[in-house]
Amino acid sequence: MALKKVKGNFFERMFDKNLTDLVRGIRNNKDNEAKYISTCIEEIKQELRQDNISVKCNAVAKLTYIQMLGYDISWAGFNIIEVMSSSRFTCKRIGYLAASQCFHPDSELLMLTTNMIRKDLNSQNQYDAGVALSGLSCFISPDLSRDLANDIMTLMSSTKPYLRMKAVLMMYKVFLRYPEALRPAFPKLKEKLEDPDPGVQSAAVNVICELARKNPKNYLPLAPIFFKLMTTSTNNWMLIKIIKLFGALTPLEPRLGKKLIEPLTNLIHSTSAMSLLYECINTVIAVLISISSGMPNHSASIQLCVQKLRILIEDSDQNLKYLGLLAMSKILKTHPKSVQAHKDLILACLDDKDESIRLRALDLLYGMVSKKNLMEIVKRLLGHMERAEGSAYRDELLYKVIEICAQSSYLYVTNFEWYLTVLVELIQLEAGSRHGRLIAEQLLDVAIRVPVVRQFAVNEMTNLLDTFTVSAQSNSMYEVLYAAAWIVGEFAGELEDAEKTLNILLRPRLLPGHIQGVYVQNVIKLFARLATTCLELQDLPGLVTLCDHVLDKLQHFNGSSDIEVQERANSACMLIEMLRNQLSTSTDAMAMDTTTEGGIPPLAIEIVQEMTLLFTGELIPVAPKAQRKVPLPDGLDLDEWINAPPPEDAASSSSSEHDKDELFVSATQAGTGADGGEKRRQSLELTPEQLERQRMARLIEQSNNPHYLKSTPTASGASNADQYDNIDDIPITELPLDMEGVAALRVGITKRSDKYLQEQQAAQGSKDGKKKHKKGKKSKKAKNKVAYNSSSESEGEPKPLHIVNTTLDMPEGVSMSDSEDKDGKYDPNDPHRALDIELDITEFEAPAVRSASKKSAADKENLKTPADLAGGGNAAKKDRKKDKDKDKERKVKREHRESKRERKEAAVQPVIDLIDADTPTPSPSHISATSNNNNTSTVLPDAPKHHKKKKNKEKTTDEAPDALATATGSSIIDVGGEEASEVASKVHKKKHKKEKSQRKEKKKASESASVSAIVSIGDYEQPLGISTPSKEIL
């Protein structure tokens, strides 16, 4: 019977599909893969219902592969747990593999796996425990971490290195899910740093380095152990981790950096591993940044790092080149001159085929700019922009050009005419750029901040408004028209020909609504400027002609589909019509007394003057934080609706397409007579001259549009001449350009900015020539003197021609502040935040400082009892009591600060001393001498009562009797008699007892220190008997 059952299972399994068959079937059914997989899933469900664990294991293996293809297998969670609990290792391994892919920390089925995983962790077979640790690391939850933390910590002490290594690595995941486990597990984790197995040691280093990545200050006392590992280990990957850790610890303790410079420099010289070299350079940079003020002779280390980074950048490997540029940018922040010497190499990286290399080189150029080389660098970038392929990289180049020039409030721009020319060139080069708004902001900012350059700016903006090509590509670049129109209107007094600029703004164009609105607004400014000129010249006919011309041109803005443009145009028309009506009466009343000498009515003059007052005054930039600093009035709720929105049902029932059309038509055709429907009817019946004018405008616009297919030229030249009678009115830059024309145009544009560069180079050359001439005269007199070059780079930089106004507009009574809300700086969901735990590393701590300070404070409190007896009246006693209370508070605070500082130095000082010693352990004689010279007591684990005998306490107890005697002496003078003598005798007895107890404690401390030091000879760790060394050793 049993044989028949075995045969049946064998024949059934012979036709089962294994994982190989599944993969082969999926490859053969590429056209209907989903259908084939659904069939396989049904077969797998049938296999999971069988009792044979091998069949279930095969089914789970196939489910694991199907899950990798993106299919959900969460429905098989119970079957996966069943396979995980198998006693066979092959099945258990497949089960844990499926669980690591299917389960996650929030899975509800994990509560069923706690006892099973604990059983595997405590198994005698190391591979069962190993596979359990590997799988658990993928789906461990806070509950599993809490329940299994002790079992995993037990494995850290296993006799098998395989399990110790996995347990150490697993503890990091436990710490993230259950931070409370860090404190009890840390002593064992620290022991593994000196484990004889290199794999376990490397795992412990990895875990501590990951823990210290976010909270490095908690692991500063472990620096001696890591220093020993760094100088003795040959494992490059472990060295990289240790060096990264030192890079995080150095800013917290700059003295540590001075000890690291020499070994790191040796590693840089000796290592051939590029990864280790890069980490060494990174750490040296961090060290030099933290100790730059205390280590003047570090230029050699910087030069070494820069030379090694140049080797990385010149390497053919793109990854090394990128890392070299990245590290070079870190050096640039603190030592820019060292990096500027390699400017040619950085500029050469702009031609690299890898875009990430080019972008990293652009970031470096931002910090290499000076007043002397700004124009040259911008010229190189403009040349790269012409040759660059891809709109994204061209946009990044444009952004970097503006960022380089505008940094630190235009610190390096010496000629703003050159900068405005560059901005105009960027507009013409990058018609389809997405940075049009950025260029517009720069144009506005320069025109507002630099008053001297405004005349040049308005002329450039007039040309830009006249020659800007409207195309489908320039959606974002339309914003420059916004800036140009605002500049010519705001600073209309700087215009050479305001009437020409007014005609340019009134020219009909297909522009976005907000651009048309700015056009209308600045037309009013220019009109007010020209009207004021007519008043000054007493030119009545010119003023009438101006009003008629502007009223006629503003009519096409009245028909705009943008409601803002309509409102502004109608308001402008009404205002100008009022002025026109007043001027029309002046011709009939020329002989009356109500007119002035030139015939302009006084009311018309008042209208022009009031219109001019609307735009008087100078605008300054608004501070970025101005709006948030405006106080809200009481009772104002910014979230409340001004007008409550109508209900959705009412809005849907009352609105329809027909109603929308009626509203739109009534808005455009409302009114009759001279201003209403009559003009609308006239626009529908165009004269032949108007039709011809519109046709010519349409042909010119089509010729300017590069996306419009032009008609082929005909053989008849006369017809072309007739067709383009107004050819002289077409601006040259709006002509359709082929590739050769574009190249020629770009060359001509680039020469405009090159003119300023040539002038700067010529001026710099003349200065250099004068310096050489003076130096040649002085060289004959100073033959025997030491040469000293007093000229610095800043002296050779050109002086700025213009002054930038940095005043910002703020609300009244509000001042600028740099305080920012930093609540969003750190992620509240970061698990490392919970791991910021102060660990009890007793090897370097001084726990007795706080208790000593408390006791000394209590002693000093006792000293005040004699003083309370002094004084004649209640008022004097109260005053003295208040003064003494204040003194007591100040002393307690001072002692608390001193104890806190001494405790911190006690934790850090052994780190530096042990690293500086270069020996595993100090000699017993040295230990004894140190403890005796510093008058410190030892810290023994079996004698906790001595923990409070520290230097701070002894100093307090030594000084307290003297202070007490002084205070008592003064009290004796005041009190006098028997009461004073009793107080003095008590003080002398107390002082004698304290001195006797201190001598006994010092003797015991020196003996225990010698014994503990002798016991711990040969270990690198500092013995427990060693007290904190004094600062004099350092």
UniProtKB/Swiss-Prot annotation:
Subunit composition and interactions: Adaptor protein complex 3 (AP-3) is a heterotetramer composed of two large chains (delta and beta3), a medium chain (mu3) and a small chain (sigma3).
Recorded topology in the membrane: Peripheral membrane protein
Metal-binding keyword on record: no
Biological processes, Gene Ontology terms: anterograde synaptic vesicle transport; compound eye pigmentation; determination of adult lifespan; endocytosis; exocytosis; eye pigment biosynthetic process; eye pigment granule organization; Golgi to endosome transport
Keyword Transmembrane attributed: no
Domain of life: Eukaryota
Residues bearing the modification Phosphoserine: S683
Keywords, alphabetical: Cytoplasmic vesicle, Golgi apparatus, Membrane, Phosphoprotein, Protein transport, Repeat, Transport
Similarity remark: Belongs to the adaptor complexes large subunit family.
Annotated localization: Cytoplasmic vesicle, Clathrin-coated vesicle membrane; Golgi apparatus
SUPFAM superfamilies: ARM repeat (SSF48371)
GO cellular component, one term: endoplasmic reticulum
HEAT repeats mapped onto the chain: 35-72, 143-180, 181-217, 219-255, 258-297, 299-337, 338-374, 376-414, 415-452, 570-609
Role played: Part of the AP-3 complex, an adapter-related complex which is not clathrin-associated. The complex is associated with the Golgi region as well as more peripheral structures. It facilitates the budding of vesicles from the Golgi membrane and may be directly involved in trafficking to lysosomes.
Originating gene: g
Compositionally biased residues, Polar residues: 1025-1034
Phosphothreonine, modified sites: T687
Name this polypeptide is given: AP-3 complex subunit delta
Compositionally biased intervals (Basic and acidic residues): 822-836, 882-906
Principal location listed in the UniProt entry: membrane
UniProt organism field: Drosophila melanogaster
Gene3D superfamilies: Leucine-rich Repeat Variant
Stretches for region Disordered: 637-660, 669-688, 701-723, 758-1034
SMART domains linked: BLVR
Biased composition, class Low complexity, residue ranges: 928-942, 1007-1016
